[in-house]
């Protein structure tokens, strides 16, 4: 598994914790709760994702609400929200990964942490955001 993939998995878990139990961000970013060995660059990338999501969460959540047709925001699982948040952050604020790769990675993370049905939902929301909110890479 790539370092970036590991970082995204850690970020999903951190965002899940933040949503579920609302601990201090500083404590979550120490990753004492994560029991696997990680490299410094994996932790650093996970920290940058989580910090970016937290900083921009209001705008990100507005987009989730706008594009999750027929879904009340409160009914979206915490895991799906975490994956959507980190993926929308990547789509809007980072440029090192192609947009379609970001969406593919989100779908794979959703399959890993949730289900095929959830993966279709996440893919649909992200695809709609990409088509309607983000200028093309070309």
Swiss-Prot record:
Pfam families: NusB
Single annotated GO MF: RNA binding
Keywords tagged on the record: RNA-binding, Transcription, Transcription antitermination, Transcription regulation
SUPFAM superfamilies: NusB-like
The keyword Ribonucleoprotein is assigned to this record: no
Gene Ontology BP term (one): DNA-templated transcription termination
Entry keyword annotation includes Transcription regulation: yes
GO cellular component: cytosol
Superkingdom of source: Bacteria
Similarity comment: family membership: Belongs to the NusB family.
Biological role: Involved in transcription antitermination. Required for transcription of ribosomal RNA (rRNA) genes. Binds specifically to the boxA antiterminator sequence of the ribosomal RNA (rrn) operons.
Protein name: Transcription antitermination protein NusB
Source taxonomy: Bacteria, Pseudomonadati, Spirochaetota, Spirochaetia, Leptospirales
Gene: nusB
